[in-house]
A protein has these predicted regions:
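Intrinsically disordered, low-complexity proline/glycine-rich segments
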Residues: 2-100
Length: 100
């Protein structure tokens, strides 16, 4: 089972686009290791990244897939391996909290 992703966890990067961190989450009451949880939502965003002159802006870099059975504050939980809207994926998560 993959680990739950949280605010500050990193993406994998893709092609020549570097990894970046999760900088926004709409979650306000659910924490893993004292860090707010990530979820599948356009408000759960990763930092802008670029490759040469091509830029993937933050508002296009949101978690676009999540757990099918685990919900956090009504939204699908984000985990290591889940997709980010621009072709990237979540690379980091909690060291001790795992879900389907």
């Amino acid at each position: 089972m993959p680990a739950v992703s949280r605010l500050g966890d990193m993406s994998t990067g893709h092609g020549c686009f570097p990894p970046t961190d999760m900088v926004l989450t709409p979650i306000t009451k659910t924490f893993f290791n004292n860090i707010r949880a990530g979820v599948m939502d356009s408000g759960c965003q990763f930092t802008t990244h670029s490759c040469g002159i091509v830029v993937h802006p933050q508002e296009e870099r949101f978690v676009s897939s999540g757990a099918s059975k685990t919900y956090i504050e009504g939204k699908q939980a984000a985990r290591i391996g889940d997709d980010i809207g621009d072709g990237d994926a979540i690379a980091e998560g909690s060291a001790n909290s795992f879900i389907e």
